[in-house]
């Protein structure tokens, strides 16, 4: 199974939107936060994760970010 960049982009947009809505982050702050996350790196490395729904992927990101204070990234 190869990386489906269309699905990766879909999940990337969903994760950014979730951060913007839930934590009131700007796009400029949410994008680098998502791009540097382990969730995004795993999404690129493990194609089976790309087939999961965006809700599941967003929950993975949220669990990862609970270890740090996301609001301090504003």
List each language-model region with its residue ranges.
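C-terminal alpha-helical interaction appendages
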Residues: 1-74
């Amino acid at each position: 199974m190869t990386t489906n960049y269309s699905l990766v982009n879909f999940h990337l947009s969903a994760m950014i939107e979730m951060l913007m809505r839930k934590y009131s982050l700007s796009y400029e702050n949410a994008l680098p936060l998502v791009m540097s996350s382990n969730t995004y790196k795993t999404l690129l490395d493990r194609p089976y994760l790309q087939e999961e729904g965006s809700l599941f992927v967003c929950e993975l990101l949220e669990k990862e970010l609970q270890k740090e204070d996301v609001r301090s990234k504003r």
